[in-house]
UniProtKB/Swiss-Prot annotation:
This is Pyridoxine 5'-phosphate synthase. Its EC number is 2.6.99.2. Pathway: Cofactor biosynthesis; pyridoxine 5'-phosphate biosynthesis; pyridoxine 5'-phosphate from D-erythrose 4-phosphate: step 5/5. Pfam families: PdxJ (PF03740). The lineage of its organism: Bacteria, Pseudomonadati, Thermodesulfobacteriota, Desulfuromonadia, Geobacterales. Keywords: Cytoplasm, Pyridoxine biosynthesis, Transferase.
Length: 239
């Protein structure tokens, strides 16, 4: 059965809006795990707009399932990861002005730098995933640089405006899953997935873990984090 990694970045976003200490992402992570999450995902951005270094260190000490650190492939972030030792690092592109990650890594353009980051992290005992668009060239490049996993960027599917566009994106995702598996890559997926569209992606099969944040935290505001996580776990489990 596919697993659920809950991204708690937006718990930190709410905290940072007032510059205080609440809500606490560490407490949110514990509640998510108790509700059935198989892992906790955070993105330590270079501008520290939500998750802070202290959060990462505390989460490493408290997370009982799996800690997945999303990060840019920079020397600073690699050094932090090697110090803290999350279970997995997912390398993502980063732009200072974006509200959220807007697309996948262009692994083909930056193969040398990404390959070096992948090697350093793996030598430190950390599994590595690359966040890529469902593009066969990017999947192949991810394999060439030695990544353990890819996380397929599902944003274009989530943003599709009509049935035809949605089906086209599902086909792209399905093809990326098959190619990645053929190349020996583990397959994760995320971005824009919610309670309405998750089953369509889950029906494709072949995905080991979904990393979902915004929709779960949004629902948690209305029904509580425990129920929000349990509802998503059920959707994935019974897809």
């Amino acid at each position: 059965m596919a697993k659920l990694g809950v991204n708690i970045d937006h718990v930190a976003t709410i905290r940072q809006a007032r510059g205080g200490v609440e809500p606490d992402p560490v407490a949110a992570a514990a509640l998510a795990e108790l509700a059935g999450a198989d892992g906790i995902t955070i993105h330590l951005r270079e501008d520290r707009r939500h998750i802070q270094d202290r959060d990462l260190k505390l989460l490493r000490q408290t997370v009982k399932t799996k800690l997945n650190l999303e990060m840019a492939a920079t020397a600073e972030m690699v050094a932090i990861a090697l110090s803290v030792k999350p279970d997995m690092c997912t390398l993502v592109p980063e732009k200072r002005q974006e509200l959220t990650t807007e697309g996948g890594l262009d692994v083909r353009i930056a193969m040398q730098g990404i390959a070096e980051a992948v090697e350093r992290l793996q030598n430190g005992g950390i599994a590595v995933s690359l966040f890529v668009d469902p593009d066969p060239d990017q999947v192949k490049a991810s394999s060439k640089v030695g990544s353990d996993y890819i996380e397929i960027h599902t944003g274009a599917f989530a943003d599709a405006k009509d049935w035809k566009s949605e089906q086209d994106e599902l086909e792209r995702i399905g093809n990326a899953i098959k190619l990645g598996a053929k190349l020996g890559l583990g397959i994760n997926a995320g971005h824009g997935l919610n309670y309405t569209n998750i089953r369509k992606v889950a029906a494709l099969g072949g995905i080991e873990e979904y990393n979902i944040g915004h929709s779960i935290i949004s629902r948690a505001v209305l029904v509580g984090l425990d129920r929000a996580v349990r509802d998503m776990v059920d959707l994935i489990k019974y897809a």
